[in-house]
């Protein structure tokens, strides 16, 4: 198991929270909670050691050219593919957008 941390510039925190996905069977769980204004913090606990660069590039592609909401995101990964990671994050962002 490996724990990774990432930070990105962000806007204001949302009001909502979201929990998407399920840990197990090659999937992941993503918990999104309001964070500190101006900062998006991501912590990844993954079963795949040595994948820090892959995670970094995935997040950079997702947030390039946009200002995400200020969130604290916890990801519990059990070997999910980058496509599944992005899908779950997008589901979480949509969830917190609904009041």
From Swiss-Prot:
Residue list for modification O-(phosphoribosyl dephospho-coenzyme A)serine: 25
PTM description: Covalently binds the prosthetic group of malonate decarboxylase.
Entry similarity comment: Belongs to the MdcC family.
GO CC annotation, single: cytoplasm
GO MF terms held by the record: acyl carrier activity
Protein role: Subunit of malonate decarboxylase, it is an acyl carrier protein to which acetyl and malonyl thioester residues are bound via a 2'-(5''-phosphoribosyl)-3'-dephospho-CoA prosthetic group and turn over during the catalytic mechanism.
InterPro entries associated with the record: Mal_deCO2ase/Cit_lyase_ACP, Malonate_deCO2ase_dsu
Domain of life, per lineage: Bacteria
Main location: cytoplasm
Protein's recorded name: Malonate decarboxylase acyl carrier protein
Gene: mdcC
Disulfide bonds: none
Keywords assigned: Cytoplasm, Phosphoprotein
HAMAP family, sorted: Malonate_deCO2ase_dsu (MF_00710)
Natural source organism: Pseudomonas syringae pv. tomato (strain ATCC BAA-871 / DC3000)
Protein location: Cytoplasm
